[in-house]
């Protein structure tokens, strides 16, 4: 499906782009450091299958932490919330997404929530399959149904770049393994997790996933109930409380919609029952969120009264 370019949306993108100079691309993952910090694109996918866009919405990017919502949805449907939340908590944290502090001081046997790296690693370790390839294929199959795009795959360069530099995540895995949180081989989990984070798509694909969540798990194009209603509700709740790293509270006040960001500069936003939003803007603020993407959502929320609060 081709998005319709929208002049009003383009004007908002132009306005939001002014803050890109204040941000920086993620340099600690070498492959992400190549991005153009001045890029900004947005697609809005409505429940009636109308799509509006501004900027270069065909440009692809990797999901990074946005993938945490999708792996969580998959394992919740596979095992149920009681089992999943016996491994990972449900409470927000004010710490950075890669912090190990709360894991050490609050509850060594359970990461606080699935949106921080420690919790996401545990969730990824629960994905069904005997090998990394089987588990990745299972996740990719799910994401292809969410996007209605069979071409979705992962970026090998980004995955390899992350795998070779993710020492803090490895440390978390070994720390949690010490406490029996998961029994998997650490390198196998790291291999799967870095490939999960490197799953690649464009703003339209991401907006389409957002629209599935907006419709409580039903795909607007195919009509398939891809995610159960209860799991969609749980995931949207986590996006409100933990989706924008340790800026989630401020984002809830200024924008007020469920959203999930990633350090590639992607943001998935959800206007319940109405539409999904896919944004790509690789210049990040100090919290790791797309600086122009957040600004664009602030403008849109104020103009179109998007806040759910």
Curated annotation (Swiss-Prot):
A Pfam family of the record is Glutaminase
UniProt keywords (A-Z) are:
Hydrolase
Molecular function via GO: glutaminase activity
Task: Specify the domain of life of the species encoding this protein.
Answer: Bacteria
Q: Which SUPFAM superfamilies match?
A: beta-lactamase/transpeptidase-like
Annotated binding of substrate, by residue: 65, 117, 162, 169, 193, 245, 263
Q: Which reaction does it catalyse?
A: L-glutamine + H2O = L-glutamate + NH4(+)
Q: Which GO terms describe its biological process?
A: glutamate biosynthetic process; glutamine catabolic process
Documented EC number(s): 3.5.1.2
| NCBIfam families given in the database record | Gln_ase
Q: Which family does it belong to?
A: Belongs to the glutaminase family.
Name of the protein in its database record: Glutaminase 2
Species of origin: Bacillus subtilis (strain 168)
Q: Which gene encodes it?
A: glsA2
């Amino acid at each position: 499906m081709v998005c319709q370019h929208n002049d009003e949306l383009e004007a908002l993108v132009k306005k939001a782009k002014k803050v890109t100079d204040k941000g920086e691309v993620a340099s600690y993952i070498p492959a992400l450091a190549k991005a153009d910090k001045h890029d900004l694109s947005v697609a809005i996918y409505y429940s009636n299958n109308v799509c509006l866009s501004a900027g270069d919405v065909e440009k692809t990017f990797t999901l990074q932490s946005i993938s945490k919502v999708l792996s969580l949805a998959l394992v919740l449907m596979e095992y149920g919330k009681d089992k999943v939340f016996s491994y990972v908590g449900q409470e927000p944290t004010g710490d950075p997404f890669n912090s190990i502090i709360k894991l050490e001081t609050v509850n060594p046997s359970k990461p606080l929530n699935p949106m921080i790296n420690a919790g996401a690693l545990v969730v990824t370790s629960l994905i069904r399959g005997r090998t990394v390839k089987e588990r990745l294929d299972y996740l990719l199959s799910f994401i292809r149904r969410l996007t209605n795009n069979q071409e979705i795959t992962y970026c090998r360069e980004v995955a390899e770049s992350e795998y070779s530099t993710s020492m803090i995540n490895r440390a978390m895995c070994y720390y949690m393994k010490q406490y029996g949180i998961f029994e998997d081989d650490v390198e196998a989990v790291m291999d799967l997790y870095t490939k999960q984070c490197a799953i690649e798509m464009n703003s339209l694909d991401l907006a389409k996933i957002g629209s599935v969540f907006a419709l409580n798990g039903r795909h607007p194009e195919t009509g398939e109930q891809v995610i159960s209603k209860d799991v969609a509700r749980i995931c949207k709740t986590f996006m409100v409380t933990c989706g924008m790293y340790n800026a989630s509270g401020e984002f809830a006040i200024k924008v007020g919609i469920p959203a999930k960001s990633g350090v590639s500069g992607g943001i998935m936003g959800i206007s319940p029952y109405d539409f999904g939003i896919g944004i790509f803007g690789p210049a990040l603020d100090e919290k790791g969120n797309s600086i122009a993407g957040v600004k664009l959502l602030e403008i849109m929320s104020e103009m179109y009264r998007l806040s759910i609060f």
